[in-house]
Swiss-Prot record:
Family: Belongs to the CTP synthase family.
Gene3D superfamilies in the cross-refs: 3.40.50.880, P-loop containing nucleotide triphosphate hydrolases
Note: CTPSs have evolved a hybrid strategy for distinguishing between UTP and CTP. The overlapping regions of the product feedback inhibitory and substrate sites recognize a common feature in both compounds, the triphosphate moiety. To differentiate isosteric substrate and product pyrimidine rings, an additional pocket far from the expected kinase/ligase catalytic site, specifically recognizes the cytosine and ribose portions of the product inhibitor.
Domain Glutamine amidotransferase type-1: 292-534
Signal peptide: none
Source lineage: Bacteria, Bacillati, Actinomycetota, Rubrobacteria, Rubrobacterales
Residues given in the record as CTP binding sites: 15, 148-150, 188-193, 224
Enzyme class: ligase
Binding residues annotated for Mg(2+), in chain numbering: 73, 141
Pfam families tied to this protein: CTP_synth_N (PF06418), GATase (PF00117)
Coiled-coil segments on the chain, per record: none
Stated name of the protein: CTP synthase
Function statement: Catalyzes the ATP-dependent amination of UTP to CTP with either L-glutamine or ammonia as the source of nitrogen. Regulates intracellular CTP levels through interactions with the four ribonucleotide triphosphates.
Species in which this protein is naturally found: Rubrobacter xylanophilus (strain DSM 9941 / JCM 11954 / NBRC 16129 / PRD-1)
Encoding gene (name): pyrG
Amino acid sequence: MSGTKYIFVTGGVVSSIGKGTSAAALGMLLKSRGYRVVLQKFDPYINVDPGTMNPYQHGEVFVTEDGAETDLDLGHYERFLDENLGRLSNVTTGSVYWEVISRERRGDYLGATVQVIPHITNEIKARIGRLGREKDVVITEIGGTVGDIESQPFLEAIRQFRNDVGRKNVLYVHVSYVPYIEAAGELKTKPTQHSTQRLREMGISPDILICRADRPIGEEIRRKIALFGDVEVDSVIPAQDAPTLYDIPLSLHGSGLDALVLEKLGLPAPPARLEEWRGLVRRLHGAEREVRVAVIGKYIRLQDAYLSVVEALRHAGGAHEVRVELDWVDSEQISDPEAARERLRGADGVLVLHGFGQRGIEGKIEAARYARESGTPYLGLCLGMQIAVIEFARNVAGLEMANSTEFDEETPHPVIDIMPDQVGVEMGGTMRLGSYPCRLRPGTLAARVYGAEVVHERHRHRYEVNNAYREVLEEAGMVFSGTSPDGRLVEIAELAGHPFFIGSQFHPEFKSRPLRPHPLFRGFVGACLGAAEEAGRVTAPAAGRKDGASG
C-alpha cells in the first residue's frame, strides 16, 4: 500500500461546486502523464445505494460494469478517465454501517462494543486501501460539505489514513467557493476562510485549495486566501466557470494543478499528453451547425436525472462537429396525438428516456408514434425501447390496448412483462444490473451502427419484451436486431424501412466517452443531421451559448 499515493478531495461553503468534476479532471490529467489512476466517491447518506432514491433528490443513478448502482459523479470519473470503475468506487454511509453491523451480528468483533471509532472508520479506510491495489494514485471525493454532521466519520477516517500510510503518500485538496458580491463589487474570501478553518478543526490541513468563481481570481485575492488557508500562494488554484465540462482539465492544467500535485507527492512529472483532448474541445467550440433533439421524459425539471444522456449526445455532436440543442419535453404534456404532433414538429430527432412508473407513459407512446409516422430519427433508451414496442403493437400490429404489466396488470396484450425470476421480489438491488452480452443480427441497423457481432452493454431494468409476442410483432415489421446470446431476451428493437428508428433495452449512455462516442448516439445524431439537412433546417449555434458546465 505504501507505494500508492492518495488524494482526498473535500468541499466547502456550498454543495455542487464541482468537487466531482475537479476530481475527475485531476485524474484525467495524472493519467495523461502516464500514471495509473482510480477514483472513488464517499456519499454520506444512509441509503445503501441510490437505486431507490427519487431522481429529483439524487439525480441520475449511474450503473457500473459490475452492476453497482452509484452516484452520478462516477459517470464523470469514467468519462474523464476513459476507464470502467466498479462498486468499490462508490461508498455510502449505509453500506459501511451495513457491513459493520453484519460483522457484529456474526460475532466477528468478539463481543466488543462497536463504535464509530474505530469500527466505522476502519471499514472506511479498508475500502480506500482495497481500491489502491495495483494503482499509482487513488483520488477519493468526500461528498457533502465540510461541517455536515453526516460527513464526520469519513473526514475522521481520511485524517487517520495519512498516519496509516505515511504523510508523504497523502494529499488533501479542498474545493471552495469564492462568491462575487454585486453590491460590494468584489470577490469575497470569508466563506473560504471559514471553510478551511473548519477543516483544520477536524485535524485536516488542506495542501491545495481549488477556488471556484464566476470570474478571474486576482493575485491579491489568492494571497489573502493563502494567508488564511495556511498554504503557499502557488497552492491556491483558481477555477473559473468553464464553457463546457471538457474545458475544465485544460483550465486546471493551465493553472498548474497536476504539476503541483505531483511535486507535493514527490512523483516525477512527465509531459501531459493532451493533444486528443484539446482536439475534442476545439470541435465542441467550433461547431458551425446545430440540430434539435426533442428529449422526452418525466424528470426534466432536473436534468441531472439524465446526465449521462446529455453527455453522450454532446460526445456524438463533437464527433459530427455539430451542436446538439436539447428540447426538453414533459411527457405528461403530449399525451394525445395532436399535442405530440404540435410539440414535436420541427425536431430533427426524438429521444425517449428511461424511467419507472406509469406517470407520463402515454405521452412517451405518442412521441414514439410521431417519430414512426413522420420518419423522424428515434432513439429509445430502456423504457424508451419498451414504449416503441407498445406503440407498434397497438397501432401497427393490431394488438389493441397492448401495454406493459408495469403499467396495466390487466392488459389483454402484455407485450412487455416482468422477468420470471423477479416475480414477488422487493425493490432494491433486484433488477437486471450491469454488463451483459448482446448478439447483433447481421444486416440490421444495429449491426451497421456498431460494426460488430457481439457487444456488451449495461442494464438497469426488471421488465422485458414478452417472447409470446415476438413472432406477431416481427410479422408486422418490427426487427429484434439484438438479443442475449441464447436468444431469450430482446436487447434491441428497430423498424425496417424507417430512416433511423431504434431502441435499446440497455443504457448505452453509460458507456459513451468524450473521445469514443457510443455508436448508438453517434448514429442517432448523424441521422438527425441528415434529417435536418434534408429539411433545410441546419442552423448555426446561438452566439455565446454555454452548456451550463462549471468546474
